[in-house]
């Protein structure tokens, strides 16, 4: 049976393809989901792909992944920069590996985006590589499992 990786997406990622394509690219979240499913299949993994604009829902899904999943790819969106609650949820499911993904290079953007509250508790972070960052995160998780 294939191991399941949760791919969790935070606020405003449902607007990909329309929202600031110069920063986030032209792919939609559905396109990224298809890429993730194809990459996961090639790695012998299954994907549980979800998106929410609500912090509490993301926390519930992190807890669920802690019970049922083999790892998490997390694009917390702006919550990554502000949410102690996401930090605590990730810490609560340790040692489950979590890879944080950001489509844009957060270090080349506004100063308030340079640091994430979640970075200290994730296994690694991929940022600035666009949608391929999700595939790279799945590869990194597969190597750890």
UniProtKB/Swiss-Prot annotation:
Pathway: Metabolic intermediate biosynthesis; chorismate biosynthesis; chorismate from D-erythrose 4-phosphate and phosphoenolpyruvate: step 3/7. Keywords: Amino-acid biosynthesis, Aromatic amino acid biosynthesis, Lyase. The record marks 19 as: Transition state stabilizer. It comes from the Bacteria. Pfam families: DHquinase_II (PF01220). Its EC number is 4.2.1.10. One of its GO terms (biological process) is amino acid biosynthetic process. Belongs to the type-II 3-dehydroquinase family. This is 3-dehydroquinate dehydratase. It comes from Chelativorans sp. (strain BNC1). The gene is aroQ.
